[in-house]
Amino acid sequence: MDEKGSPRKKSRSISYGKWGYLFIAPFFLAYLVFSLIPLISTFYNSFFERYMVGLDLIGPTFVGLENYYSLFTQGDFSKYLSNTFIIWILGFVPQLLVSLLLAAWFTDLRLRLRASGFFKTVIYMPNLIMAAAFSMLFYTIFADAGPVNSVLMSMGMESPYRFLANIGSTRGLIALMNFLMWYGNTTILLMAAIMGIDPSLFEAAQIDGASSPQIFRQVTLPLIKPILIYVMITSLIGGIQMFDVPQILTNGNGNPNRTSMTLVMYLNKHLFSENFGMGGAVSVILFLISAVLSLIVFYSFTGKMQRGGNKA
Amino acid sequence: MNSRAKNAAQRSLSVRRVFCYIFLILLTFLSLFSFYILVINATRSHPDIQKGFSFLPGKSLIFNLKNLFTNQNLPVLSSLRNSLFISACTALVGTYFSAMTAFGIHAYNFRFKKFAFAFIMMVMLVPTQVSALGFVRLMSTMGLRNSFIPLILPSVAAPIVFFFMKQYMESTLPIEIIEAARIDGSNEFHTFNRIVLPIMKPAMAVQAIFMFVASWNNYFMPALLLDSSNKKTLPILIAQLRSADFMKFDMGQVYTLVAIAIVPVIIVYLLLSKFIVRGVALGSVKG
């Protein structure tokens, strides 16, 4: 499929090259208008003081890096950063462990689980659910007078457990929802990775008398490492973007006492109150964090493609 | 291996199998229990729900629906229509242009091809939220606040869909087909629309479903852009319900509204789950 091979082909494809530009033009135009210009203007805004007091607009005045300075000294930025990180870890660790286990089981040739199609269907389902509706549902289910408390009370608990008034249970509920929404997706990605491994490697290990856990640890895990990195970093970037679930569950306040307020919820607050200077500064920091992570993914990606490039 | 060892191996395998099933059933329960409560409670009336939890559905679904659709404070019908319109347009626009971009990079050689591909891969993982501030301001100055255009047109540049299409083309679209069309005198756009798109149908279908669902579920951007009540989408309505004085609400209506937002997606998913699950695996990086 590579046309660089023969010079004749190459010279012919040059005359069609302009079509390539035409075909990719809409993408780049849309990206320019809807992402790149907004991105630059967000950066630009982060250097200005500009906010509303009642109906009066303060600024815009150029303040240099002052927004960044006050972000780290006055606001609770570091608190929100650690909230985001803690909640992400709480959901991601069980997600990865369970997904690895399920992916190993579903692809195990000796185990041959029945109804695996049914289970795959079920575990992937929560991924397609509207996060806003899902968290609204959790809010009603875990409310003081909700079904979970009514079951707990009927089992002999004296007063309802106030899930959204405690730090641990609130963070736990958000993490549980993140877990439920993503473990199916991760399982299927890992399964695809495992099924991409040359079966003769497993056969060889089996003939050598390796047990299933041994095969998993010493053959499967090292070979799916690139996908594990991919899963890890896309999940981390997804975690940085965490918004809908905690926003709806805590009504945008990050209760109790802003311990479940995430970075994007904080950004959203600035955008709604039209505090564009501070909002810009938060955006730039978010951008920097994800840019570093994206670069890592990008390099692990391209490294992979060069190795598997001739497969197509 | 003698027969005794074989028997022992068989036995340990069945023990493992039982353990797997127990674990899977637990996970299934965990994944489904909230949806079960949702469906049950959507069919029960407010006083019934207040009385406590029940495992059996009630008879008030029609009653709840009627209350919900006539509720003056919740423009459910118009938000349902808005959500459907935006999601359908996003899916159409997004898949068509992503296939077009992928085709441009797959089928032609030009100077900035490598750069273009690398660039798209770079932007793939930059969250949309980081440019939200500039985006909302730009759309306001362009007079596009409260319009669906800023929710639909940005999907022309959907890097993840592009990447999926590109991978699919690599395995199903030989350049020879395009060359044959050229010899027959087909114009390049004609080739794309009449020959490439039909070949891409399975990939287009899977990605259209994903884009539809993602747009249907989107809350962050619509909430920032749409504030007039006849333009609201379903997620905004749900958020509005959450921030309203909750105790005064008819819980039957609350559950029914959440069900309206979720259940159609579940039904479509159950019908198409084979494609969807395959689609996720297809789009992933292959080893």
What are these regions (language model features)?
Chain B
Residues A8, S12, R16-G287:
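A structural signal for multi-pass alpha-helical bundles of membrane permease subunits
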